[in-house]
Amino acid sequence: MKFTTLTFIVATFICTISCSSDKKVSMELPMINLAKDYSNEKKNIHEIADVEYIPLETTDESILRGGWVSMSNEYIVIKDKDICFFDRKTGKYLWKFNRTGNSSEEYPMFNYLAVDFRSEECYIYTPIGNKVYVYTYHGDFKRVFALEVGKEFRLSIINDYNQDFLIGYNGFSYRKDPTLLDSHPYYLISKKDGKVSPLPLTVKRPINKKVKPTGDDGYMDSSMIICEMINLLVNENEAFIGDFALDTLYTVQDYKLTPVAVQSPSVFSGDIPLVLSADLFTDTYMGFYAIKLDADNAWKSITEAPYLYWNRKTGEVHRYELYDSNILTEKVYNPWMHNTNLNRNYGVTRLRAEFLVEQYEAGNLQGELKEIASKMDMEDNYVLVLCKFK
């Protein structure tokens, strides 16, 4: 691995504990009890968040299947089969680009997108050649760099960290060959030249998407898939890391690695690993699943996992069933920020056009949603719901 000034920057990380000594901080941090049976509490999303509904304009050029979301004060960017730009306030479709191809200025495969709204650049990662392609907002090629790492390496997530670096996770840490397990799987990546350096966080027994122990400190493949729910989230200039194999949760801000909480019981305290899988991390709330990684009951492990909210300010944990008072029928949804680049304290969710039209015709909508749905067609794009947590 090549080390340049990036190594010096990473060396400035301050950690109040030895990052490989996960147990030392358990007595000093807030404890999140994953084993407790929390009772369901119905909660109106409007009580804990300011909610915006953005109907994304449907044109022949802007038909969306789903897609990951990035946003600034001006734009909403959807990474779907293309990279589509919409107006942040109105949802009006603006433009899109797709540079898939085989030339030196095109990417052969499109895995992950990180948008830098400061420099107005789009960073596209492809595992083919382990490269990051950099484009302008309109898809004009700027540069490409290969991630030169002296071991098995493939990013399973990449996101914007600050003006100089991206942050990513090495997906090869879940290979079943223990010799390929990456004990430092979280990386800063230079936006200038792609130089990489691991964060000083040691993960001795990575498990992530692999759940069945092999007896040699490695984990083998199983049918358990946690749908890319890797515990790396970014809340503006603060990154959250909650590796499945560690009891301690961390944040990374201003090149400082700080433990913020510890789960109980310990991940490996029982026969089946119990992990905290977060997809929301704001100044006040962390939203997460408490999942028993049971290889013999993989689907059940996911479908029966409770979704909980930890209040970072009070230390309380709640099992909220969030509903929207503008929808007069039961619909629970949990805003998320996984693989997104949002304004601070925002989570997102989607409301399908088909659902909204059906509820409108049944008289089950009110307020702004009723007005939006009255103008919609079944085939329209979804309404993006932006939730700014209080």
Task: Tell what function each PLM region has.
Residues 60-61, 98-106, 146-154, 202-207, ...:
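Short coil/turn segments at the loop-to-beta-strand junctions that recur within blades
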Residues 127-184, 198-212:
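Asp-box/WD-like beta-propeller blade repeats and closely related beta-sheet repeat scaffolds
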Residues 258-278, 312-344, 357:
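Conserved blade-ending motifs and adjacent loop-strand segments that build the rim/top face
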Residues 15-18:
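C-terminal motif of bacterial Sec signal peptides marking the signal peptidase cleavage site
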Residues 134-137, 181-194, 246-250, 301-315, ...:
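Beta-propeller blade signature
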Residues 57-61, 92-127, 149-150:
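Blade-loop segments of beta-propeller domains
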Residues 34-64:
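A short helix->beta-strand "capping" segment at the edge of beta-propeller domains
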